[in-house]
Amino acid sequence: MDKPTTSAAAAAAQDSNLLPDSPQHGPTLSSASSFEALTRHDPNLSRLATKMFNKTEEYITHELNAPLEDYKLLEEMNKATIAKYKDMRQIAENLNTSTSELSLKFQQLAPMMQQIDEISDTVDKLEAAAYKLDAYSIALENRVKCVLQRKSGGGQVAQ
Protein backbone atom coordinates (compact mmCIF):
# COMPACT_ATOMS: atom_id res chain seq x y z
CA MET A 1 0.00 0.00 0.00
CA ASP A 2 1.17 3.52 -0.80
CA LYS A 3 1.59 6.02 1.96
CA PRO A 4 -0.75 9.03 1.82
CA THR A 5 0.95 12.18 0.61
CA THR A 6 -1.50 14.76 1.93
CA SER A 7 -2.75 15.37 5.43
CA ALA A 8 -6.39 14.76 4.35
CA ALA A 9 -5.42 11.40 2.90
CA ALA A 10 -3.55 10.61 6.11
CA ALA A 11 -6.62 11.47 8.21
CA ALA A 12 -8.83 9.30 6.00
CA ALA A 13 -6.45 6.36 6.33
CA GLN A 14 -6.32 6.80 10.08
CA ASP A 15 -10.16 7.06 10.28
CA SER A 16 -10.53 3.85 8.30
CA ASN A 17 -8.52 2.12 10.99
CA LEU A 18 -11.02 3.31 13.65
CA LEU A 19 -14.11 1.86 11.91
CA PRO A 20 -15.23 -1.55 13.13
CA ASP A 21 -14.71 -4.32 10.67
CA SER A 22 -17.39 -6.44 9.10
CA PRO A 23 -16.56 -10.12 9.35
CA GLN A 24 -17.10 -10.54 5.62
CA HIS A 25 -16.53 -7.14 4.02
CA GLY A 26 -14.05 -5.26 6.17
CA PRO A 27 -14.68 -1.76 7.63
CA THR A 28 -18.33 -0.59 7.88
CA LEU A 29 -19.86 2.85 8.25
CA SER A 30 -22.13 1.88 11.13
CA SER A 31 -20.97 0.64 14.49
CA ALA A 32 -24.48 -0.50 15.54
CA SER A 33 -25.37 -2.64 12.55
CA SER A 34 -24.68 -6.33 12.41
CA PHE A 35 -26.84 -6.71 9.29
CA GLU A 36 -25.03 -7.59 6.14
CA ALA A 37 -26.98 -6.49 3.10
CA LEU A 38 -25.76 -9.29 0.85
CA THR A 39 -25.79 -12.08 3.43
CA ARG A 40 -28.69 -14.46 3.90
CA HIS A 41 -30.54 -13.96 7.16
CA ASP A 42 -33.46 -15.42 9.08
CA PRO A 43 -36.78 -14.51 7.30
CA ASN A 44 -38.70 -14.73 10.59
CA LEU A 45 -36.32 -12.20 12.12
CA SER A 46 -36.76 -9.96 9.09
CA ARG A 47 -40.56 -10.20 9.33
CA LEU A 48 -40.50 -9.43 13.06
CA ALA A 49 -38.11 -6.52 12.52
CA THR A 50 -40.33 -5.11 9.77
CA LYS A 51 -43.38 -5.51 12.00
CA MET A 52 -41.54 -3.81 14.86
CA PHE A 53 -40.51 -0.90 12.65
CA ASN A 54 -44.08 -0.54 11.33
CA LYS A 55 -45.50 -0.57 14.87
CA THR A 56 -42.84 1.90 16.00
CA GLU A 57 -43.67 4.15 13.06
CA GLU A 58 -47.38 3.94 13.91
CA TYR A 59 -46.69 4.69 17.58
CA ILE A 60 -44.45 7.67 16.81
CA THR A 61 -46.95 8.98 14.25
CA HIS A 62 -49.74 8.84 16.83
CA GLU A 63 -47.53 10.41 19.47
CA LEU A 64 -46.72 13.28 17.12
CA ASN A 65 -50.33 13.67 15.98
CA ALA A 66 -51.78 13.69 19.52
CA PRO A 67 -50.69 17.28 20.29
CA LEU A 68 -51.94 18.31 16.86
CA GLU A 69 -55.35 16.82 17.65
CA ASP A 70 -55.28 18.57 21.03
CA TYR A 71 -54.60 21.88 19.31
CA LYS A 72 -57.44 21.25 16.85
CA LEU A 73 -59.76 20.51 19.76
CA LEU A 74 -58.64 23.68 21.52
CA GLU A 75 -59.24 25.64 18.34
CA GLU A 76 -62.78 24.26 18.06
CA MET A 77 -63.40 25.03 21.73
CA ASN A 78 -62.13 28.58 21.22
CA LYS A 79 -64.42 29.02 18.23
CA ALA A 80 -67.39 27.75 20.24
CA THR A 81 -66.48 30.05 23.13
CA ILE A 82 -66.18 33.02 20.79
CA ALA A 83 -69.61 32.24 19.34
CA LYS A 84 -71.12 31.93 22.84
CA TYR A 85 -69.60 35.22 23.94
CA LYS A 86 -70.83 36.87 20.74
CA ASP A 87 -74.36 35.61 21.49
CA MET A 88 -74.09 36.76 25.10
CA ARG A 89 -72.88 40.17 23.94
CA GLN A 90 -75.86 40.47 21.59
CA ILE A 91 -78.22 39.50 24.42
CA ALA A 92 -76.58 42.05 26.74
CA GLU A 93 -76.91 44.77 24.09
CA ASN A 94 -80.59 43.89 23.59
CA LEU A 95 -81.15 43.97 27.36
CA ASN A 96 -79.41 47.33 27.57
CA THR A 97 -81.62 48.72 24.79
CA SER A 98 -84.78 47.33 26.40
CA THR A 99 -83.80 48.69 29.80
CA SER A 100 -83.13 52.12 28.33
CA GLU A 101 -86.51 52.11 26.57
CA LEU A 102 -88.31 51.04 29.76
CA SER A 103 -86.50 53.71 31.77
CA LEU A 104 -87.55 56.37 29.26
CA LYS A 105 -91.17 55.16 29.35
CA PHE A 106 -91.12 55.20 33.17
CA GLN A 107 -89.80 58.77 33.14
CA GLN A 108 -92.60 59.74 30.74
CA LEU A 109 -95.22 58.02 32.92
CA ALA A 110 -93.91 59.42 36.23
CA PRO A 111 -95.91 62.71 36.03
CA MET A 112 -99.06 60.78 35.11
CA MET A 113 -98.53 58.38 38.01
CA GLN A 114 -98.12 61.39 40.31
CA GLN A 115 -101.42 62.78 39.00
CA ILE A 116 -103.05 59.38 39.61
CA ASP A 117 -101.73 59.43 43.18
CA GLU A 118 -103.11 62.96 43.68
CA ILE A 119 -106.48 61.92 42.21
CA SER A 120 -106.51 58.87 44.49
CA ASP A 121 -105.85 61.08 47.52
CA THR A 122 -108.62 63.46 46.41
CA VAL A 123 -111.02 60.53 45.91
CA ASP A 124 -110.15 59.24 49.39
CA LYS A 125 -110.87 62.68 50.87
CA LEU A 126 -114.08 62.95 48.83
CA GLU A 127 -115.16 59.50 50.01
CA ALA A 128 -114.50 60.48 53.63
CA ALA A 129 -116.52 63.67 53.10
CA ALA A 130 -119.33 61.64 51.50
CA TYR A 131 -119.43 59.31 54.53
CA LYS A 132 -119.54 62.33 56.86
CA LEU A 133 -122.26 63.91 54.72
CA ASP A 134 -124.20 60.63 54.72
CA ALA A 135 -123.90 60.39 58.49
CA TYR A 136 -124.96 64.02 58.82
CA SER A 137 -127.92 63.51 56.46
CA ILE A 138 -129.03 60.43 58.45
CA ALA A 139 -128.77 62.40 61.69
CA LEU A 140 -130.65 65.31 60.11
CA GLU A 141 -133.31 62.93 58.78
CA ASN A 142 -133.72 61.47 62.25
CA ARG A 143 -134.12 64.98 63.73
CA VAL A 144 -136.65 65.88 61.08
CA LYS A 145 -138.60 62.70 61.84
CA CYS A 146 -138.49 63.52 65.53
CA VAL A 147 -139.71 67.04 64.90
CA LEU A 148 -142.45 65.77 62.61
CA GLN A 149 -143.48 63.16 65.14
CA ARG A 150 -143.70 65.82 67.84
CA LYS A 151 -145.78 68.03 65.61
CA SER A 152 -148.04 65.23 64.53
CA GLY A 153 -148.00 63.56 67.92
CA GLY A 154 -148.40 66.75 69.88
CA GLY A 155 -151.30 67.89 67.74
CA GLN A 156 -153.21 64.68 68.27
CA VAL A 157 -152.78 64.82 72.04
CA ALA A 158 -154.09 68.41 72.10
CA GLN A 159 -157.34 67.52 70.35
UniProtKB/Swiss-Prot annotation:
Q: Which domain of life is it from?
A: Eukaryota
List the residue ranges of the region (Disordered).
1-37
Q: For bias kind Polar residues, which ranges apply? A: 14-36
What's a single GO BP term from this record?
A: autophagosome-lysosome fusion
Which GO-annotated molecular functions does the record name?
Answer: gamma-tubulin binding; protein homodimerization activity
Alphabetized UniProt keyword annotations: Coiled coil
Pfam families assigned: BLOC1_2
Q: Record's InterPro entries?
A: BLOC1_su2 (IPR019269)
A cellular component annotation (GO) from this entry = gamma-tubulin complex
Task: Note the coiled coil stretches, chain numbering.
Answer: 69-134
- Member of which family? Belongs to the BLOC1S2 family.
What the protein does? Component of the biogenesis of lysosome-related organelles complex-1 (BLOC-1) involved in pigment granule biogenesis.
Record note on quaternary structure: Homodimer. Component of the biogenesis of lysosome-related organelles complex-1 (BLOC-1) composed of Blos1, Blos2, Blos3, Blos4, Dysb, Muted, Pldn and Snapin. Interacts with Snapin.
What protein name applies here?
Biogenesis of lysosome-related organelles complex 1 subunit 2
Q: Which organism is it from?
A: Drosophila melanogaster (Fruit fly)
Gene that specifies this protein: Blos2
